[in-house]
Swiss-Prot record:
This is Co-chaperonin GroES. It comes from Prochlorococcus marinus (strain NATL2A). It comes from the Bacteria. It is found in: Cytoplasm. PANTHER family: 10 KDA HEAT SHOCK PROTEIN (PTHR10772), CO-CHAPERONIN GROES (PTHR10772:SF58). GO terms for cellular component: cytoplasm. Heptamer of 7 subunits arranged in a ring. Interacts with the chaperonin GroEL.
Amino acid sequence: MAAVSLSVSTVKPLGDRVFVKVSESEEKTAGGILLPDTAKEKPQVGEVAQVGPGKRNEDGSRQSPEVSVGDKVLYSKYAGTDIKLGSDEYVLLSEKDILAVVN
């Protein structure tokens, strides 16, 4: 994971890219057993922090993104690039890797 000294407000995704703050992974099982870091699953849910301007169509126009800042999304398990800003973890991914908006 790349450790960089940026802030969320300075990250501007390009094209159809979406910058998502990763939700915290579960610390313990339903039975109360604490999980070590090596046993935790990579989270697939997060909150959209920044959105690019959208994908370019063949005619040069932009297709508006289907997600917006603040949306809670479910994304593909191995999608995107992991980025750590301070103590928070983010993933920069293509909009096509977002599977659903979670209400």
